[in-house]
Amino acid sequence: MSDYKFETLQLHVGQEQADPATDSRAVPIYQTTSYVFRNSQHAADRFGLADAGNIYGRLTNSTQDVFEKRIAALEGGVAALATASGAAAITYTIEALAQAGDHIVAQKTIYGGSYNLLEHTLTQFGVTTTFVDAHDLKEVENAIQPNTKAVYLETLGNPNSDIPDIDAIAAIAHKHGLPLVIDNTFGTPYLIRPIEHGADIVVHSATKFIGGHGTTLGGIIVDSGKFDWKASGKYGNIAAPNPSYHGVSFADAAGPAAFVTYIRAILLRDTGATISPFNAFLLLQGTETLSLRIERHVENTKKVVEFLANHPQVEKVNHPSLPEHPDHALYEKYFPNGGASIFTFNIKGGREEAFKFIDNLKVFSLLANVADVKSLVIHPASTTHSQLNDEELAEQQIYQNTIRLSIGTEHIDDIIADLEAGFAAVQGQ
């Protein structure tokens, strides 16, 4: 179906015909833990990767399979692996690339959970990270060490929606024989496909825009199929015979899909952050309306940014669509159809004013999720990024007067009126 447009692919890939067992047009929920083999040889072939198909529910499921194929197609990858959460997708990706003694280069301004994973949790397992200003290409390249295993970026940083120059950083990574990993959660494949700009691996918290309704946890890893795992000699767990899987080389056995096949066969097998069939089904429902929802998110965001940029109680709006934003040129290059419906602004005052503004909103919900059809708000410094010290917060341009908004799909008049009510409360009106 590669010739079809995005809006068609999001509805049909993975189930081009009715379900062969039931003739159901909707993708069924295959709520099972295991699968019957036709005979002993069939079982042996499945376990030996000689025959593709279901082995056990921790590894594969037919509902999950449709979701994986659909997101892989939307991102332009060769294969994908769904996980129980976005955090699991990111963790598995790094664990597949780096072991004790290895090193990662990562953008400074990333999601707080990803920052903590790289800065604290993985250091306990011997993997270190150098955080860089992704706008300084020399700094990015100078951070690469002999033991570096990957460069890690976000298409739109969390929470400020800052934008790296993906093409340029991909060239640096590939010059040093490294894969470029990009979290495209905020970008979505409808607005940007990082693989087309040189990314080798794309990850998502599918909980966000892909699901879109704040109901379902899930993550997904997309393999571009373009990285040569054998060339550098650095990725033995993927390219060399694997002793925990009867000596198979995933690069040989799975070809372009070696990366996600390794994660499925080894990391998912051993640690089990498996997506449930029901969650895969719900994420498929979200995928089917992705383009429609994103268009409304973008339309509303443009109007909210304009409103905030001209409001006397706003100190600064951190949105790349604004001409004065340092990433404006990159925004126009990588997001010609708009984007960044999750962003921050700094209210005049400090923490007290930020809290009062937030606590007087009614349409916006105060919660930690983003990318919902409902508009959402939070104070990052005291919540999502509260594990960071003052210096780390400043590096990510998060202050006590910083407020994060996730613009939903409500009527724009109601969104603006709610924000006005928040500002009025701060003024004591």
Residue ranges of model-derived segments:
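N-terminal glycine-rich, Lys/His-bearing helix-loop that initiates the first secondary-structure elements
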Residues: 1-51, 428
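Conserved N-terminal alpha-helix of the aminotransferase class I/II PLP-enzyme fold
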Residues: 39-88, 113-120
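PLP-dependent enzyme catalytic core of the Aspartate aminotransferase-like
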Residues: 119, 128, 146, 293, ...
